[in-house]
């Protein structure tokens, strides 16, 4: 659904895997339209086995009379029959931003052996790995010159990246000019921190 290109990734079904393993009651999947319509005003939903849904229904019924049915209707009327076209419009806005990140990373970092990164076909993030022990340093260097990045370890449980190497890049919000400047700063910080580490080890 959140594809950047017409041919997105095909994701495996966790429910099919759980059912095949006899653990269907162990999976509860949450989703919302927050990145489809409007953050904070979307429709949330969950999927689970009938047994789990029955148990959740008993608990949730105590907390609320019911969901916001007007908002549900608003979403049905807006998205009915045009969800794919709506998401293609999203992709047209953010795809150039991801392509710019890829262009700058490839130009500035490719072949240096100091960073690797994903080239996603969908979603909202690029996962960047720098040399072990440098993510926090790179983020601090960037912040010192005015670029605020997602904290190191944000993609790990409890925010703890044992290798201190992963940085999550979220290029959807800024303009192309802002992203260009940010990636120029980031790649320079990566090169500088990497050089410091290599020279310090000699």
Model feature map: region roles:
Residues 1-3, 34-37, 50-53, 71, ...:
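Short, solvent-exposed loop/turn segments at secondary-structure junctions
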Residues 1-15:
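Conserved PLP phosphate-binding loop immediately N-terminal to the Schiff-base lysine helix
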Residues 57, 128-168, 176, 180-181:
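Conserved C-terminal alpha-helix-loop-beta "cap" of PLP-dependent enzymes
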Residues 19-95:
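Conserved core segment of the aminotransferase class I/II
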Residues 27, 115, 147:
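Short, conserved active-site loop motifs that form the nucleotide-linked donor/cofactor pocket
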Residues 23, 144, 160-202:
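PLP-dependent enzyme catalytic core of the Aspartate aminotransferase-like
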Residues 91-102, 114-129:
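Conserved glycine-rich beta-strand-loop-beta hairpin in the small C-terminal domain of fold type I
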Residues 31, 45-47, 119, 125-129, ...:
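Short beta-strand segments
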């Amino acid at each position: 659904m959140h594809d950047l290109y017409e041919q997105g990734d095909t994701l495996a079904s966790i429910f099919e895997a759980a059912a095949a393993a006899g653990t269907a009651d162990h999976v509860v999947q949450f989703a919302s339209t927050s990145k489809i319509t409007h953050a904070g005003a979307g429709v949330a939903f969950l999927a689970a086995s009938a047994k789990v849904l029955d148990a959740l229904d008993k608990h949730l019924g105590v907390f609320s009379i019911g969901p916001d049915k007007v908002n549900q209707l608003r979403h049905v009327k807006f998205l009915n029959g045009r969800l794919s076209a709506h998401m293609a419009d999203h992709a047209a806005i953010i795809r150039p931003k991801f392509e710019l990140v890829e262009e700058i990373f490839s130009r500035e970092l490719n072949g240096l052996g100091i960073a690797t990164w994903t080239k996603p076909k969908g979603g909202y993030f690029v996962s960047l790995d720098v040399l072990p022990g440098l993510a926090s340093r790179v983020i601090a260097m960037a912040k010192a010159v005015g670029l605020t990045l997602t904290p190191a370890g944000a993609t790990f449980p409890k925010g703890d990246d044992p290798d201190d190497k992963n940085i999550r890049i979220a290029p959807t919000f800024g303009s192309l000019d802002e992203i260009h400047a940010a990636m120029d700063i980031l790649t320079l910080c990566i090169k500088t921190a990497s050089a410091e580490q290599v020279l310090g080890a000699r």
